[in-house]
Structure formats: C-alpha cells, structure tokens
Amino acid sequence: DEILPQLEGSVDVLAGNSSGGIAAFYSNTNVLKIKVKLSFKFHMGHMPYTGQAGFDLYIGNTYHDMKFYRTSNFDFNKTEYEFTYFNHANMNEENKLFVLNFPLYATVEEVLIGINPNSDISPCLDLFKNEDKIVFYGTSITQGGCASRPGMSYTQILSRMLGIECLNYGFSG
C-alpha cells in the first residue's frame, strides 16, 4: 500500500487485476458453483468478456493432465454473478483435482466456491512439480490481453505445460 500512491494511475488500478491467480483443490463433488463479486464492470470492446471477468475451470488428476471444462458466463453489466459449472446427480464421485483460473482484467473482491454439502474438499498443496517459480513482467499480452478465457493467457498455458507456478506481472497500457 505504501508504494501504490507512487505508481501511475493505470498501474495502480491494474495491480488489483487477478491475472494468473488460481484456486486449486481436490473434491469428490458432483456440484460446482461460484459466486463472484468484482470491483467494477468491464466493457473492453476488443476482448471477450469471458477473458476479462470470467473464471474458467480445469479438471484432472494432476495439473499437467488437466482438461478444460467450462468458462463462467455472466451478465457483463453487473459486478456480481453466480455460475454453475455442473450439477450432475450421477457423476462419478471419485476425488478429482479442480483448478479455477481467475479473470485476466477484473479485480476480484470475493469468490465463493459451492459444492455438494456431502462432498469432501481439500486444498491442493502439491499442484506444481517443484518450488521454483517463473516471473513474467510485461504489457497487455503478458497480462492476458485478448485471450478468450483466463486459461488461454500464455503464462497459464506455460504453467500447465511445465508444471511450475508462473507469477504474472503484466500491466496493460
């Protein structure tokens, strides 16, 4: 907070964007929902709303073998939304790894994850193969500019391919 007043106005705002953020957990749920609160609405005409303020979901057994499942859809005129990724009564209830990629251009104030109340959930503490990290610093392309959804920014693609945490310090403009 001490440094923010010294930054140019746009960097101050962009520093709150959640590009590169993830929530990773194991669960045997057959229901997955999110409830999201964003700081403000987004209307960037050159980029899909799903990339700007959507969350996308990957499911698998390990981070390296994850498959894209779905991206949240929402009313882009609102700062709060709820989205159900799935609600399958007959879904195989074995433990799976779930990774939610956070929006590329939104400042997320709150995200709540809802699962079946009879299901187990635990944080994924072993997501990456090693403790090393790759730090990316750059402009809008690094932040994820114009990607159709959060998991398609190049830093997230590399993170999945290499199994390593990528820290995204991309700032548009």
Regions found by a protein language model. Give the residues of each.
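Conserved SGNH/GDSL esterase-like catalytic core that processes O-acyl groups on lipids
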Residues: 92-96, 103-112, 127-173
